[in-house]
């Protein structure tokens, strides 16, 4: 009975992956789901997962012994990137060390578009930097791997951007430069992770996980205004203009600071979201979602319709 360990199920991607893994797991598979804190998972969700045969327990990327406890006897494990910017490569090394000590054969990692940028890390955009380091650690580990480079989630727009539009004078300030980007549904990223964990990918392969088409932020905004609720004005700004607007208003400069503003991203994270699109990192689509899950990727309209009460 092969054992598969899905870590980080208390988060959005991990939770989606867990539910899909239970749908597609071959008969006789052992599924172990871990979270750093069981309270992150609704009790009803835990009940459903348990009834379907999953074991749910705690483990932390910062605690190698907790990882070794759950990795023992596993064929494959996952590493879902966290919000611990700067500390993520060490968390990855902990997972790698624990996996190797337990005889795990394969690791599946949720990376990010742009992690293959050949530039020196300090010259790369902010968001892919840790991912480039982590991918290098995984390749050097000797473990078999599957890496999925997720594009920016379309879910980020209702979750992180829309709450700030009223604060900005009913405007979406965008530094994406009018360049199209293939935003992906977070749901599809979770499903891809489950598929890779359960062996649907090719060994030692990197997959770009994208939406079905590349669209501009202005197109997305126009669709929201026409189909959900008029949000005001779409305004194109430069990276520097974005900083000049937000920094005097108190937007945090580091991830560790908690924003008191409707915009909850720190300035580097916020600017980089637009930069990734503007510089063409997200211009090309892939067939990864359909190949690995058997379902076409969700469109931005599909996703935003689910968030219509947010706008």
Predicted regions and their residues:
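Oxidoreductase cofactor-interface core, primarily capturing Rossmann-like NAD(P)-dependent enzymes
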Residues: 2-30, 34-45, 62-65, 83-90, ...
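Residues lining the SAM
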Residues: 7, 80, 294
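Conserved Rossmann-fold cofactor-binding substructure of NAD(P)-dependent oxidoreductases
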Residues: 43-50, 54-75
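A short helix-to-beta-strand connector/capping loop
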Residues: 49-55, 142-143, 230-232, 294
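Redox-cofactor binding/interface segments in oxidoreductases and associated redox assembly factors
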Residues: 76-80, 109
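A hydrophobic C-terminal alpha-helical subdomain
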Residues: 240-311
